[in-house]
Swiss-Prot record:
It is an enzyme of class 2 (transferase). This is Stress-activated protein kinase alpha. One of its GO terms (biological process) is mitotic cytokinesis. It comes from Dictyostelium discoideum. One of its GO terms (cellular component) is cytoplasm. May be involved in cortical F-actin organization and resistance to osmotic stress. Activated upon cell detachment, in vitro.
Length: 638
């Protein structure tokens, strides 16, 4: 074996064994050459390809540095026809980012099948953090409309991504992907989405202007015909809705305004409401065109038997508890947690991320799919300190212990590659956001339902064995599902009320407007502290009902500019939000009892429920009298 072959063998052996120290030693002794970095092992892999497959970030970083120093080209193909970037798109997001940041990286390099790295990225990348590497691709000038041998674009490939397909499709469309590029069989991404049976994907592609009349040469079917064949009534109806609009636009010569109609969601059943204001929103300025559109939409309205549009109503449905997922057991690190019943440890490949819902100090929240169910996925930030791990375990412990229809359902946790909590998705958002939506009519019936379900959720926690104190109860932490049911959530600050947790419970937590006075004075946080928070939520609900719009607690006190001022005033001056004058005395009394400065005087959740039922019966016996108390404030009043 020659010295060059010996060096090459030593390098490949060290990389295969993830021995970074050995590679550094070889480098320091000048035993790694440019040819070593561009050579292949018996399986046709380069040293960098091996490091990428091993997902070893430190090794990849080291080899990339050596490529720069020795001027080795990382864009060359291995014996399997793949470049380093083709391989990197299947790696951890940090590793992919590092390869993309390499100065001379070729993002459009094609393999034997003419697939570019972004083809594979769109199909195989798993992390919900797909936006950052995608933007690097864009900055490097990637061709998002590149076609492989079969004519497939990255958009076609994204349809097959089992983890982040909807997010990937969205990124592609926002960055110039042509929604109507077809394969050699004349099939568009819309054909692929219909076959997959994903109505959400179909909707996104249609809104982007997908051609509904494109006929595939293999089966001689349009996407609409495929949907009919699949027997998917909802998808068929959706595609027909777009097809009818496109046909109408073509018939009257308005095709060039298709995107404007789609953006404003002006379909055939809405065209009768066309107005000058809507045309302004659509950006249609030509006087002649505006007159023609108004004339044709008016004619259409006269032809149709129009159904009167009604404001959004809150519909009562029979409540059904969520299904309990299969249990796969606990990992060793969580097995010793006390009070934990059955819980599911979820593999990351069982999840599909569909939409980013928000971000906070603890991480990001995505909407997604788990075993066909729509879920919320809380992806926690990287946890490197033992304190952060302990906080995760405590929330995991609480979530795993509770099984109640009044508490957001916990499906399980993902432990790698990132810590995630997988929960029931409540599509209407928080109770705060529901109350803050002025288009919703929240009368007394809805107020009582929201109040009773909130208290039942907290009662469930307080009656658990051992009892659980929420500690961060507020309208933002009460979620509303599509059936308008309240679900208690966010147990990041919650604790079992046991001896070992007393010291932790003393620490001030939660939002100050909902915080009980005893917490300010450093006393033990108890179930009665949660009851104080319930009082503020009852105040929010009653005020929203009577005034017809949401008012923030303590917003009437203009001198209180900061949250900490609120807790000082509530504790030292016994300040409370102002209850509306029109509020029935029975509700006034209940709210005041719940936020009594002396925690011993506050009722239990069971007592609150009993009183709420009595008050609701009082309302039902005097519905007109109670409804007369609702006098909405002017919309422009602060």
């Amino acid at each position: 074996m020659s010295s060059t072959q010996q060096q090459q063998h030593q390098l490949f052996s060290a990389v295969e064994q993830n021995d970074v120290t050995k590679v550094k030693k070889l480098s320091s002794k000048k035993k790694i050459s440019k040819s070593n970095l561009t050579s292949f092992d018996q399986y046709g892999q380069s040293a960098l390809t091996i490091a990428l497959k091993n997902n070893n970030e430190e090794m990849v970083e080291l080899l990339l540095s050596l490529c720069v120093t020795l001027k080795a080209d990382i864009n060359t193909f291995d014996k399997n026809g793949f470049s380093a970037l083709h391989q990197a798109v299947s790696s951890d997001d940090r590793i992919l980012m590092r390869v993309l940041q390499y100065e001379n990286i070729n993002v459009d390099v094609q393999n034997d099948d003419l697939n570019t790295p972004i083809h594979y990225f769109c199909q195989k990348f798993r992390s919900p953090n797909c936006q950052e590497p995608f933007q690097l691709f864009i900055q490097k000038g990637v061709n998002v409309n590149a076609q492989n041998k079969n004519g497939e674009t990255p958009l076609h490939k994204a349809i097959f991504n089992n983890s982040v397909r909807l997010m990937m499709v969205g990124l592609l469309l926002k960055n110039g992907a042509n929604v109507n590029l077809a394969t050699q069989f004349q099939e568009s991404p819309l054909h692929y989405a219909v076959r997959l049976g994903r109505e959400d994907l179909v909707s996104v592609l249609l809104k982007a202007g997908a051609d509904v009349d494109c006929v595939g040469t293999k089966e001689r079917k349009t996407p609409y015909q495929l949907a009919v064949e699949e027997g998917n009534k909802d998808m068929t109806a959706r595609i027909k809705k777009y097809k009818d609009l496109f046909d109408w636009l073509q018939k009257h010569g308005f095709e060039q305004y298709k995107d404007a109609f789609l953006k404003e969601e002006m379909f055939l059943d809405e065209l009768g409401e066309m107005s000058e204001d809507i045309l302004n929103k659509m950006g249609i300025t030509s006087t002649g065109t505006r007159l023609r559109i108004l004339k044709e939409t008016s004619n259409l309205a006269n032809e149709q038997t129009k159904k009167p549009k009604t404001p959004e109503l809150i519909i009562e449905e029979d409540p059904t508890p969520p299904d309990t997922p299969d249990i796969s057991g606990l990992r060793h690190s969580l097995h010793t947690l006390r009070h934990v019943g059955e819980v599911n440890i979820i593999n990351d490949n069982e999840l599909e991320y569909t939409e980013k819902l928000g971000a906070g100090s603890s991480g990001k929240v995505y909407k997604g799919l788990y075993r066909g169910k729509e879920v919320a996925i809380k992806v926690l930030k990287s946890m490197t300190e033992s304190k952060e791990i302990e906080e995760f375990k405590k929330e995991f412990q609480i979530m795993s212990a509770i099984r109640s229809k009044h508490v957001v359902h916990f499906y399980g946790a993902v432990l790698e590659p990132k810590l995630c909590m997988v929960m029931e998705n409540c599509s209407r958002g928080s109770l705060y956001h529901v109350m803050d939506n002025n288009s919703l009519d929240i009368g007394w019936e809805r107020t009582f339902r929201f109040a009773i379900e909130t208290v039942r959720g907290i009662e469930c926690l307080h009656k658990w064995d051992p009892p659980i104190v929420h500690r961060d109860l507020k309208s933002l932490n009460l979620l509303v599902n599509d059936k308008w049911e309240i679900k208690v959530c966010d147990f990041g600050l919650s604790r079992f009320n046991t001896g070992s947790n007393l010291e932790t419970l003393v620490k001030m937590r939660g939002t100050f407007a909902y915080c009980a006075p005893e917490v300010y004075y450093g006393e033990q946080f108890s179930g009665k502290s949660d009851v104080y928070s319930i009082a503020v939520i009852l105040w929010e609900l009653v005020t929203r009902c009577i005034n017809g719009r949401y008012e923030r607690p303590f917003s009437e006190y203009k001198n209180l500019q900061h949250d900490f001022q609120i807790i000082i005033q509530t504790a030292k001056k016994n300040l409370r939000p102002t209850i509306p004058n029109a509020c029935p005395e029975s509700l006034v009394s209940l709210i005041q009892d719940c936020w009594d400065p002396n925690l011993e005087n506050r009722p239990t959740c069971t007592d609150i429920l009993s009183r709420l039922v009595t008050i609701e019966n009082e309302y039902r016996s005097n519905i007109q009298t109670w409804n007369n108390l609702i006098v909405p404030l002017p919309k422009n009043q602060e």
